[in-house]
Amino acid sequence: MSYKVNSSYPDSIPPTEQPYMASQYKQDLQSNIAMATNSEQQRQQQQQQQQQQQQQQQWINQPTAENSDLKEKMNCKNTLNEYIFDFLTKSSLKNTAAAFAQDAHLDRDKGQNPIDGPKSKENNGNQNTFSKVVDTPQGFLYEWWQIFWDIFNTSSSRGGSEFAQQYYQLVLQEQRQEQIYRSLAVHAARLQHDAERRGEYSNEDIDPMHLAAMMLGNPMAPAVQMRNVNMNPIPIPMVGNPIVNNFSIPPYNNANPTTGATAVAPTAPPSGDFTNVGPTQNRSQNVTGWPVYNYPMQPTTENPVGNPCNNNTTNNTTNNKSPVNQPKSLKTMHSTDKPNNVPTSKSTRSRSATSKAKGKVKAGLVAKRRRKNNTATVSAGSTNAGSPNITTPGSTTSEPAMVGSRVNKTPRSDIATNFRNQAIIFGEEDIYSNSKSSPSLDGASPSALVSKQPTKVRKNTKKASTSAFPVESANKLGGNSVVTGKKRSPPNTRVSRRKSTPSVILNADATKDENNMLRTFSNTTAPNIHSAPPTKTANSLPFPGINLGSFNKPAVSSPLSSVTESCFDPESGKIAGKNGPKRAVNSKVSASSPLSIATPPSGDAQKQRSSKVPGNVVIKPPHGFSTTNLNITLKSSKIITSQNNTVSQELPNGGNILEAQVGNDSRSSKGNRNTLSTSEEKKPSSNNQGYDFDALKNPSSLLFPNQAYASNNRTPNENSNVTDETSASTNNGDNDNTLIQPSSNVGTTLGPQQTSTYENQNVHSQNLKFGNIGMVEDQGPDYDLNLLDTNENDFNFINWEG
């Protein structure tokens, strides 16, 4: 009996009469499930296939002629070929255009009939779609290339036309503005994020432009727009913005007398307008909220005018006093406020040739005795604190010493004072004529030496180079010593440390004349005007005819510095310093001075000198002096003129002005002292100007229009020394060491036992100053003084300035 499953009851249990077969039932169930799943998968696959087929059909069936832009991009090379063909056609290159159209598969009739719109043609089975070509006279490709190349040159800094440069600048400006906008937007977003993180953000809308204007200080509306205009218009502070921050910190000092020192007034709320904060406030009144300070380097002073003592406001209260500096810590504000007589702490940096040779000379017993006898007492002077004075033995007055101290970088305002001081020295009595009676000339008194302050070792030697001048001396014609200075190029490796110009002073006092010593020291007590590189200044002297010269170069070391701080003994022919004799000076040994002060000859030569043998002195200026002023004080008894009187043409014709001033000089005691001699002026004959002087009974008339004359035979009390009218020396004739001793200009009283060999001589000293003599461009002038009836003792002092 077979079992037949009912279709309506698939899960029915068969009757018990038929046996149950489990395996068969299981197979039937699996087959049913498989059929169901297969049908579902087939259904899904069919749907997917249908969708794919639909998409493919849509892509295939989509019309390509409707989207022209996409077609141009897909056919970009065809478009370029079209413009190339158009350019070749309009450039009259027909053969080239035909060959190019054939190779590029283009329609040859296209160049003749420009296409107005897209068309499709079939050529050899290939579909070629042509886009519209812009019609231009020379071809669109050519014009496009011109614009492109112009802008490319402008952007690459290779030139370009003016229009291209303007266009490029506009493009750059737009790019910069966009960059600013983007940076401000990022900054505003960061501020908003910080405010939200701190819980201070209330959905405000921050405009980046307003924020940028507020940060730049421009007056604009607040950057934060308020939601309700009726609420309190106080902006919400944001920590990220440093300008909007408001910290309620009390000020350092509140100098408000009405509210008190401890009261703090409320400050105005911050806003975007910052124009009325600083400039409109009164600086003479205290501003609440601004700290009040004083400069720590300035003392507190009461200022009734109301000028501010600091950068904020004036401190007029007593509860805020800054510490006051002690007077020793106060500094000079300007260099011109320094007085002229203030001594400087720096000593001289220069050392003469004789002082450098101190360590090489062994001081013997004789040198020690001379140093013991010749030591002068140095005392601080009252007229010039920068240079001490020398007290000569036997004299109660002090003389200015040649010390090493100098004023560095003399201000421009002090030059006039220095000129006036020099004018007083050149115009009035000799500064060394105020000493009282000295011992007689028979008693041997040593010459005063100059004590020098110890110098400091300096490491910096980059100064002006020293010029070396070898001097050759020779005795000619019975004692006529002619010395010429030869210039030698200075070495580049050695640099001089001296910048001041020394003076050479001969026969300055009685003791020097007595011992036949030649001593050098400064001729003025004012600071040296050559300490700093001077400039051309106007003449400040009371004499309009005097020309001090134009200082065009920095002062260099004078070759006369080798004689500085030493004494010359004409008897022994040696230079003696503080430590004894230094070196011998004779005709074979050259000295480093261009000024030849010849040694007095002995024996017959001295007798010839005493018997009025004419002498000649050739003076050459130092190397490097652009304008040289020569100051000579002659103590000659009598000056005889020579035959060829030549005077430089650079001497001004201002003799009448000087004559009127000198003629009214109250210091003169004679009627014919102030007569000027200007009739001997002639044109110069050569570069070396020779200056010869007339034979004058009264030497005071020995003046040129630009020379300063000063009477040196008077005391500071305007009392004439009558004893100076006589000669101060005797000539025995048989003594080789006997010299012609002119009278001293320091007021020495002569005894009755001293008789004069020349009774007709007038022994008044002459102070001559030659300014701008013999100046030739690019040539150093030489001064040839043909002096007759004079010797080396007639030169009181010779000073180079320039």
UniProtKB/Swiss-Prot annotation:
Matches recorded under PANTHER family: LISH DOMAIN-CONTAINING PROTEIN, TRANSCRIPTION ACTIVATOR MSS11
Any one of the GO BP annotations: regulation of biosynthetic process
Function: Required for diploid filamentous growth, haploid invasive growth and flocculation. Putative transcriptional activator of FLO1.
Lineage: Eukaryota, Fungi, Dikarya, Ascomycota, Saccharomycotina
Compartments in which it is found: Nucleus
Location (main, coarse): nucleus
Comp. bias regions, Low complexity: 41-58, 310-320, 344-356
Residue numbers spanned by region Disordered: 1-20, 28-71, 104-130, 258-409, 434-506, 566-625, 647-757
Domain named LisH: residues: 76-108
Protein name: Transcriptional activator FLO8
